Structures are given as C-alpha cells and as structure tokens.
Amino acid sequence: MASGGVAPASGFIDKNASSVGVEKLPEEMNDMKIRDDKEMEAATIVDGNGTETGHIIVTTIGGKNGQPKQTISYMAERVVGHGSFGVVFQAKCLETGETVAIKKVLQDKRYKNRELQTMRLLDHPNVVSLKHCFFSTTEKDELYLNLVLEYVPETVSRVIRHYNKMNQRMPMIYVKLYSYQICRALAYIHNSIGVCHRDIKPQNLLVNPHTHQLKICDFGSAKVLVKGEPNISYICSRYYRAPELIFGATEYTTAIDIWSAGCVLGELLLGQPLFPGESGVDQLVEIIKVLGTPTREEIKCMNPNYTEFKFPQIKAHPWHKIFHKRMPPEAVDLVSRLLQYSPNLRSTALEALVHPFYDDVRDPNTRLPNGRFLPPLFNFKVNELKGVPAEMLVKLVPPHARKQCALFGSS
C-alpha cells in the first residue's frame, strides 16, 4: 500500500523538503481492521485536503520485497465528480507528466474498504484500472482513502448530451461499440471475478473520445453476491434500476446489471432514458407502459412477496414502436432480451456479445467514422473465456482476431 501526504495548501512544495511539516499517523492505525499487515503501512500525512487546484499531494510507493521506495507527487488540477462517497479530481503526476484521476473517500477506520478490495481484483481493458492508493487525514482527524486511477476524459452521459445538443442521433457504430464493451466488462466482472457492479449508468461509463474504448468505473457499490445472503435493495441509480430492486428484492443476482445495460443501450438508441421515473412507483409505471403488466409468474421471479398485489392490467407496447422506424431490428431484439421482467430470462453478458447486433464490429473491414481502426474488442484472456461453450467461442472471437486471443494461441 502506498503511503501518502498532502503538501501545504499554498499548492507548492518548498524546495527545502525539511520545511514541510510531516507527522506520523497515530498508533491506532496499526490496529485498524482496514489493513492487512502485509499490504499496508502507516501513511505519512501533511495537513490539507488536497483537492484544490494547484495543491500537491506527495505519496511513496514500493519499499516491499526489496523494492526501492519511490516518491510520487500529484498536482490537483480540477474536481471532475463528487457525490455522497466523496470527490474525484483530476491530477498530474509531476515525475512523469501522466494525468490520473484520484477518488478520495471518507474511510471508516473499523472496516476494510470494499471498493479498494474489488479494484485490486480487476484487470480488464474495459474496466478502469487502479494504479495505487494512499491514506490522508484532515485537520478534523478524518481518515480518507485515495484511489489513484487511470484518467479517461469523457463519459457516455456527456457523449449522449453532445448528440442531443446537436439534434443528431448517435452514429450506430458508436452505439454498438459502447454497448459491446459494457457487455464485455460485465461478462468479466460477473463470470471471472464474481462481482455485481450495482450502479451501471451512463455517468459510470468512461470513454476515450479518440479511440472509443470504454471503461466501467465507480465500484463503490460493487459486491460479491452470495446465493442465500440478503443484499440491500436500495441500490443502483433511478432510470437504470431493475424492477426486482423497485419491488424491494434482497436476493437479486448479477442480472440487475444486465437490466441497467439494457437501459443504457436503449438510451444510446433513443437519445433519452427509457424509463425516466422520479420515484420507484413512477419508474415501475414507465416500465409497465412498455413491457405491460408483469404476469404472476414474473412477479414471483422478481419478489415472491408481491404475487397477490393487484396491478392495473396494461398491454405491452411493441418495442419496435418505441424506437424510430429505421431502427435495425437486431438492435430492438437485443434490447428486448436484456429488458425482461424475469431476471433468469434476461440474456447474460456473454450471450449479448454474440448477438447479431454486433456482427458489424466483428467484421475486419469495419472502421470508425474517421477511418481509424476500432478499439481492441477481442483480446480475451483465458479467464474471460473459462467455461464458454465451443459454439459460442467461435461466434465470440472472429477468425481475423484469433491470433490476439489467448485461448486460440497462434492458430
């Protein structure tokens, strides 16, 4: 674990290093449940909160297993996001010039940070990567965990807004690329890691506007779901909440992420949210207006406690009437497979990847609108393809990409 400090609020480090007042964290840190002895050392802290523009944060990494200790300094540049969790700011590494994002969250000293534990497990081209982390404190003696993450400049949310402002539809190739990469990331976190993200929404989908590579971020709500163990149902942001969550289910599955991905795909195609309710009841009404009243069987799949509840009988609205006339039928079909009332009837992320809607991105001749190559889509690692049936594998990895795919070797 990297240790960390924050330079004085003036924003500049005194060239005379000894003039910066540095104090050790209290001894209680050694007994904190957050730490595993092997992975953490007490952080070195300098006062200040570190997020103001020009503020410099100094951390050290290494120093384990004979590695040399290395000092890294970050200059805070601007706040790029905040919420109940804390703040995310853009910073520049002064030693390398690299831009990073630093997510700063208040840390309860009694517990391990679940987001940090999850981030350490993740290694995937469509998931934002953790570079390192360190602790810092404020004058009020509050402990903060700082996650240093790779910086990706755009979000799907802002890309959607951009096309809306221009009164244009998002080019279909971007809809395909973004939704494909969401499904690939979900297949990895669900199957290889066993984690449910629980907050898939356009704001948590980062995009490089030049390459159009997408990365899922914000694992603050993510959790390993254990069958038979209850979970909180008030999870996931409105518009993207699966109906079983609105019904208060506590034994849900990773299929809640699939519903959210279906909502995002619908929004990419429409330019606006599919189910824009302000409250749980409003959202349910919006869902029922499209999918129709759930059957008793579907309600049982979502939350068995509601089977006797009397819902107004509304007929399903055909999906093709929700989208414009020229919408490719494959797009409509995929949305309908992701947005099923019964969680077990929704496509899995892997099944979505082999859907005909993505045949275009598997074509070696497909290019971005500016003529550039598509981002890497088929560089699957062995753990991503573990247990995938042969007939699915053949669809998943097109012949031209098999050289870059671990499972096919050099064949």
Curated annotation (Swiss-Prot):
It catalyses: L-seryl-[protein] + ATP = O-phospho-L-seryl-[protein] + ADP + H(+); L-threonyl-[protein] + ATP = O-phospho-L-threonyl-[protein] + ADP + H(+). This is Glycogen synthase kinase-3 homolog MsK-3. CDD domains: STKc_GSK3. It is an enzyme of class 2 (transferase). The active site is at residue 199. The keyword Transferase applies. GO terms for biological process: cell differentiation; signal transduction. The modification Phosphotyrosine is found at residue 234. It comes from Medicago sativa. The keyword Protease does not apply. One of its GO terms (molecular function) is protein serine kinase activity. Residues 74-358 form the Protein kinase domain. Transmembrane segments: none annotated. ATP binds at residues 80-88, 103. Pfam families: Pkinase. InterPro entries: GSK-3, Kinase-like_dom_sf, Prot_kinase_dom, Protein_kinase_ATP_BS, Ser/Thr_kinase_AS, STKc_GSK3. GO terms for cellular component: cytoplasm; nucleus. Keywords: ATP-binding, Kinase, Nucleotide-binding, Phosphoprotein, Serine/threonine-protein kinase, Transferase. Absent in leaves and petioles, very low levels are seen in the stems and roots while a moderate expression is seen in the nodes. Its EC number is 2.7.11.1. Belongs to the protein kinase superfamily. CMGC Ser/Thr protein kinase family. GSK-3 subfamily.
